[in-house]
């Protein structure tokens, strides 16, 4: 989790989490030079890793084998991601045959894998891929990572300064709404947290405490009884959700569209282009599956864009699946502007979602409201969010 630890909590929340044994060895990444060639040494010996801690002004201390870095993927997290990969294999390889059972090098273009640049998401995707391809894969697919400035899997205020201004506006609004409500629990939280009151913006931030509490619960670490209060936990959850994501639900429809457009508009444009390429090229398009590893901000933002947000923080390992279907009885050809006979189904975990924007007649498969027409799906996440003066997202971001 994040680095927040209530210093006076009882039972105490440990500063060091010994839950990362799978990360205690590094594959050697030192390059060897052989003439004009540069490559990895044969055998690739493993180098043990231990974490060095500093506590106040004391001399640095060496942690135990298996201690975690802040925010690091734990052993349990690795197993969870492998299980997710195995579930995807059972569904899309064994049952649907989207990929061959033993992935070979010539199948590389059928599977698109991308992660944000953070080590936790890269490691998560690596574990997922191990579960997906199975033990008999002939070839290991590559994972793509973008530089921070080019990232579109989550809102990117570095690339879009105007978005950063809007994000701060809604964070400030959340402070005005929730800090007075949180004050009700000052006597509960402050004694555990070195006298710090629970606030979104003052001193130790509430989001850090909330993250630590969720991580502790997920790993079987007991919270102080006073922090187990369901009303307190719900209030904290809603406060942090509004602080981070309030702009997606702005009451001003123009501002709401602008926020969504600048936050995840580029990502959804790319996603719809991928669907359109499949619809227009058919089997000539080699890609059969894409797996993208993002963050809570990715998942919550996507559900807001689709108007299906449940206003809960995503569980660890939560995912949103978008499946493209074709009506083989449709004979009308698909074009970039109109893609008849193609449908999108959204799945949040095992739940099939009914998108509000697809419920009108003609915007879903008759009798199957969860199957949104591809045209209607694009209208929801791209067309209706376009800038009224026709500016591109890049132009709007730098205005």
What are these regions (language model features)?
Residues 1-112, 116-290, 294-399:
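Signature for phosphate-centric chemistry
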